[in-house]
């Protein structure tokens, strides 16, 4: 079963544990995990980085018996303990790729003081360039310039202080929306600092998308 859910604001920070406990409380007939047979087998979607929020998160759970999707949703809602909001439950083929492997793009909304920066181009024009550079600076002072153009499918201005970014998985790798925004604002990115963010900005992942052979995106 593919579960789409949302973590309540100011809720748990350990989503993996919250999902595991929810499945255990639900009483659903689950397949056991390989490491601990008392735990359910499940696979979470791509995790959020530090300083990011999400409107939709994903988990695939493996059941040992056929249970209607409506019943699965009802039992998970009852077992969520006020930490998670179940948005959708869908039966998917057993051999279907996990969300981790299926996701080809992610859409983020970014809100912050863009008007406080001297920007020569709109975000649309900036990311429409043939090459878009981000600068990474190490603690030793060495700088690395990286072309992040392959990772940015689209950029859109929503209002003066809010944009939307569609980021792609390119050759199995992602960049964070923080990296894209830093590039646009002309801010250097500290290399190898996973907890780094662009101060004063909020980053919300609206959803993950799979891509067909024609390049069209579909919400997972």
Question: Which positions does each model-derived feature cover?
Answer:
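A contiguous pocket-lining binding segment that forms or flanks enzyme active sites
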Residues: 109-141
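Ordered, amphipathic secondary-structure segments that act as subunit-interaction surfaces
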Residues: 53-109
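Short amphipathic alpha-helices in soluble, non-transmembrane regions
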Residues: 69-80, 120-129, 180-182
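Helix N-cap motif at beta-to-alpha junctions
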Residues: 64-69, 113-117, 170-171
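Terminal, regulation- and interaction-focused segments at domain boundaries
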Residues: 1-12, 59-62, 104-115
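Core RNA-modification/binding signature centered on pseudouridine synthases
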Residues: 2, 7-10, 35, 39, ...
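N-terminal, positively charged regions that mediate nucleic acid binding
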Residues: 1-42
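Short, charge-patterned binding micro-sites
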Residues: 32-61, 93
